[in-house]
Amino acid sequence: MPKRTDIKTILIIGAGPIIIGQACEFDYSGAQACKALREEGFKVVLVNSNPATIMTDPSTADVTYIEPITWEVVERIIAKERPDAILPTMGGQTALNCALDLHRHGVLEKYNVELIGASPEAIDKAEDRQKFKEAMTKIGLGSAKSGIAHSLEEALAVQAQIARETSSGGYPIVIRPSFTLGGTGGGIAYNREEFEDICKRGLDLSPTNELLIEESLLGWKEYEMEVVRDKKDNCIIVCSIENLDPMGIHTGDSITVAPAQTLTDKEYQILRNASLAVLREIGVDTGGSNVQFSINPEDGRMIVIEMNPRVSRSSALASKATGFPIAKVAAKLAVGYTLDELKNEITGGATPASFEPSIDYVVTKVPRFAFEKFPQADSHLTTQMKSVGEVMAMGRTFQESFQKALRGLEVGVDGLDEKSSDRDEIIAEIGEPGPDRIWYLGDAFRLGLSIDEVYAETAVDPWFLAQIEDIVRTEALVKARTLDSLSAAELRLLKQKGFSDRRLATLMKTTAQAVREKRIAEKVRPVYKRVDTCAAEFATNTAYLYSTYEAEHGECEADPTERKKIMVLGGGPNRIGQGIEFDYCCVHAALALREDGYETIMVNCNPETVSTDYDTSDRLYFEPVTLEDVLEIVDKEKPVGVIVQYGGQTPLKLALDLEANGVPIIGTTPDMIDAAEDRERFQKLLHDLGLRQPPNRTARAEDEALKLADEIGYPLVVRPSYVLGGRAMEIVHEPRDLERYMREAVKVSNDSPVLLDRFLNDAIECDVDCLSDGKRVFIGGVMEHIEQAGVHSGDSACSLPPYSLSQATVDELKRQTAAMARALNVIGLMNVQFAIQQKGGEDIVYVLEVNPRASRTVPYVSKATGISLAKVAARCMAGQSLDEQGIHDEVVPSYYSVKEAVFPFNKFPGVDPVLGPEMRSTGEVMGVGRTFGEALFKSQLAAGSRLPEKGTVLMTVKDSDKPRAIEVARTLHTLGYPIVATRGTASAIEAAGIPVRVVNKVKDGRPHIVDMIKNGELALVFTTVDETRAAIADSRSIRTAALANRVTYYTTIAGARAAVEGLKHLQNLDVYDLQGLHASL
């Protein structure tokens, strides 16, 4: 059936901020869908609260709303835009849940809007655990023995029933809440106490207060099938995926391999037929789904775990692994096409989309964790997802792609590095999976354990264990050799197994440089193969490439052109401190330079992103972003310029080495990047410009640090040099804390010194993004942070334009920014962080740090001002001046845009959610309003902090915050919210003549604050404490209780003031489209 003509306007719901379990794969699918539907002549309206996405670029959809994704707000957009249909399958769980809410509240009916891509019935049947189980039984597929519970009593009854059916004693047992994402709130319980804890949390987090309690399948094998089905019942399997880690670990936290490696042909056909039966029964007939299976290795019993009736993390992986654009195809199926009518773009239309992709290589995905940011979190892997990003690699064999993926992770390893030689530690680590288990598996074989012994501890399939054992055995042989004694054939064999130059250098006690020179001399070089969906049966016209070491005269398919090329280095895996914002910049660089007639080359290894989409750049190399891999590509392609300032710290770390190897880096020079990063050089630069910095010193030993600290005076910010995301930063108030820090943090510093800065109390922090062509400096935007200095800039909310600074201060910030940009000869982007302290009625400006690269605020500033800074800066790097691009005056919008950070604390119950100098947010949202208050309120709503319409507010603040707390209390009282406060705070509020009730601090006896939070007596909590370790520890129970009981809380007085500002706007919400806002500038 050709496309439908009865619908004209389609609303796409995005996925919102990046959280654990829902990352930038939905930006990739949403951007694809917008493109696909506009190609077909539909008008596309998009809503997404995340400004760091490509899909919210004003050019991606026809009308773009950066607004909170709640059904009430989306209803306003529907009323304004009157779409004919909603496509809810591109925005992950957020979009599905929002679409179901619209359905339940009668909004779809009221405005006569149809859901396309998946019907409410199909979504419900797939997402509602009980209905799904009944559907599976109906088509004769097994599912785990389980039951549904809506209360703790029911849950215990189900558990007892399963214990009787499975004769397993009833533990371990798995708990899965309905309609949540990435297994949120779920887990595995090994005893009754754990069971009750997990059930209570799960009931609370499930929007339908429903749990599925099921038998434990720990140790079973897990597989996924990516399936696409159309109205005519054409079905194709895009890709089979096998989890290296057995059941019991969320698939998002597992190492996965495609295509599945350990299935026999017969088993594969059984899974294939089963997955098609599942789609038919659930009723998915216009798009993609992923179906997860589990197989008991003992007796072959197969069961269906779950299916997602939408584009998912796995489908992004399958798209990148095969080159088959699932999201684009699913969007076209949703408007009536069938698979045989669509062409496969990769083969230039030589094959229809109804051909199943076949691949002649192996793909390995490895997750990236961020537990170093959450030392109190439980790092054991269970059914609740905890990873923050992932790396994908391709090779001709499992070993090659596996070792490439490990070095692409950027966790300080070059392959299967040694973790430990302590037998007890190794046995414990392989038995209880944590983020490093794969390296401990290598250590187990180094100890001499057999495959059977390791299998007994881990339940990892013996085929994978044999591959890992072989890598370890090979390493032992290499250790006994010298580099000179290796023949070309031996070296090639090692490279075919995926060993990196650096790993070989470590094993043979030499340098990576020496290994590289030997390789070049012996002509052992990689060849590049194309991803073509058809195992090279048809010619492909897209250059989507990966490296591999083949036999001596292996055919290289790179086939470089003679055009002028610019190469962009991507940011590698998502992590806290380096996320989608950097990918956004890389994509914009590729798009801008492509428009200008350069051939663009992208190098990256993150499968979730738009940058690794085969049609973002002219040529895509899906490779780890390491020196060895980048130098080989440069040698092949010979670009005229390489951009390193867009991918965050990942490419920057390579800048000096690349330059030393003759790679043409364009934009700000690596030497100047170093001048800004190196403490002593930067100090001299500021001194020459006559700019202020907080008093600071550099210490190289503990005793020296204590002496220097006394010179500056406490409180201090201490940190190692060269960090991103504030890793290992702390605010210390006394020598005792500093001693402890020096003992613990020297581990972090790799012989690099520790930096001490005077901490500026009660300062306002600001960010300025600017760009320069080497002559003129253009200010992109000045942002004022809402949280005070001392909260990491990535975790602070901020406003553009500033909401409280005087024009004179803003002008001074711009003057200082321009002076530094000139002194550093910046070509491209630069970001400066300032702190402003009031002394005697005057604003004193201090420079905190300068980053001569793209910063994480670039996408937000671009959305707020309507100028794509990353595009303009990329053109500057390629030699176009600002005048030639017609960029003259800074844009200061007449409306406010507020960016707010989003945190993963609900995934890590043990972690204290207090904000500090370490960055811990995973994503961001933006709110737009005519006033600062309106924009702020929307940013809170979008970040999931519900501001209550009524109810009691608790205030407990440190002494220095009391004057401002009185103002907050006065507004609350005027708005009609009753106030309770702890003794000290209450007497200050009372003295100002505002009614308040006194409550007990936790140490003053019961009933105290935490009891009130647990009993649901409080609607909002404002709690601020001194930055001392003791004060933070004392008050921790208030914050964790508020978090656990889902009471909205603010831990800074600035946040509290902002929240109260937002409370004034509860009733009247307006929605604004980006195109309309930009047109008004």
Curated annotation (Swiss-Prot):
The keyword Protein transport does not apply. Mn(2+) 2 binds at E306, N308. ATP 1 binds at R129, R176, G182, G183, E215, L217, E222, G248, I249, H250, Q292, E306. Keywords: Amino-acid biosynthesis, Arginine biosynthesis, ATP-binding, Ligase, Magnesium, Manganese, Metal-binding, Nucleotide-binding, Pyrimidine biosynthesis, Repeat. GO terms for biological process: 'de novo' UMP biosynthetic process; glutamine metabolic process; L-arginine biosynthetic process. Residues 411-558 are annotated as: Oligomerization domain. Residues 1-410 are annotated as: Carboxyphosphate synthetic domain. Belongs to the CarB family. This is Carbamoyl phosphate synthase large chain. It comes from Ralstonia nicotianae (strain ATCC BAA-1114 / GMI1000). The gene is carB.
